[in-house]
Amino acid sequence: MFIALWEFFYGHFFRFWMKWLLRQMTGKCELQRIFDTYVGAQRTHRIENSLTYSKNKVLQKATLVVQSEVDRCVEDIMKEKNINPEKDASFKICMKACLLQISGYKQLYLDVESVRKKPYDSDNLQHEKLLIKLWNLLMPTKKLKARISKQWADIGFQGDDPKTDFRGMGILGLINLVYFSENYTSEAHQILSRSNHPKLGYSYAIVGINLTEMAYSLLKSEALKFHLYNFVPGIPTMEHFHQFYCYLVYEFDKFWFEEKPESIMYFNVYREKFHEKIKGLLLDCNVSLTLKI
């Protein structure tokens, strides 16, 4: 109740007068003051909030701009706020960078969601090739005897046909598994080997798909904003999402063996504990979670 009242009071009264007072004192609008004071994710986050809570329709709409309209949007903002480019030459550059990050994050979510919604299709030759590629990357010295085979359990699938394990995350789960195995082959082999530990073992592929869901949910909830705003100076792409996934895979394996669960039956408990740890790290405005080998 108190928080709701404070937000109402701040948004409708206090914020307006504070902005007015600061403009009189500094001769600069709130957006300019943010650029003068902050860098990295803090800057983009504060710009996004300033635009979102502005009563000015031009500024409000800026958070919804598509990438192709960013340049024109920046010009509209400068006109609306009476910013002279000759007196503040950096404003245009800084605002464009922020809007590209803001619009890029929204577009990245749409791109990831689009891939996630595509189910694995065994009649799709590209899907089948990708699945076989995963096997060859993880088991280079062992030939897959048949497409439907108990051998899939060797890399952590549950049944004889892996397509059933991709239902939740669609083709996105497979793409992530292949990306990690292709770009961090040595680490993938090491983690696959560790996943066969007699006591602390887990299903490598199933856990990998589970971590795709974690990465996706963090992106959807906007928890990845600080990370991506710091990690990517321009427009975040699927490549950056895959990189974050790789970080999760590597760090989860370390976490699992450090925690030493009594059995795989406690997977959900430790998975959630790991999830909370990552969410905590992502609250830091200076965060940049990159895989460091």
From Swiss-Prot:
**Organism per entry:** Bos taurus (Bovine)
Q: What does this protein do?
A: Acts as a GTPase-activating protein (GAP) toward guanine nucleotide exchange factors like ARL2, ARL3, ARF1 and ARF6, but not for GTPases outside the Arf family.
Domain named ELMO is located at: 126-282
Q: What parts of the sequence cross the membrane?
A: none
Protein origin, superkingdom:
Eukaryota
Question: Per the record's keyword annotation, is RNA-binding included, yes or no?
Answer: no
Identify one Gene Ontology CC term for this UniProt entry.
protein-containing complex
| GO BP: any one term | regulation of defense response to virus
Checking PANTHER family in the record gives: ELMO DOMAIN-CONTAINING PROTEIN 2, ENGULFMENT AND CELL MOTILITY
Recorded hits in PROSITE patterns, A to Z, give:
ELMO
The UniProt keyword set, sorted, is: GTPase activation
Which gene carries the instructions for this protein? ELMOD2
What is an example of a GO molecular function annotated in this UniProt entry? GTPase activator activity
Q: Kindly provide the name given to this protein in its UniProt entry.
A: ELMO domain-containing protein 2
Checking InterPro entries in the record gives: ELMO_dom, ELMO_domain-containing
A UniProt-annotated Pfam family: ELMO_CED12
Q: What is the residue range of the signal peptide feature?
A: none
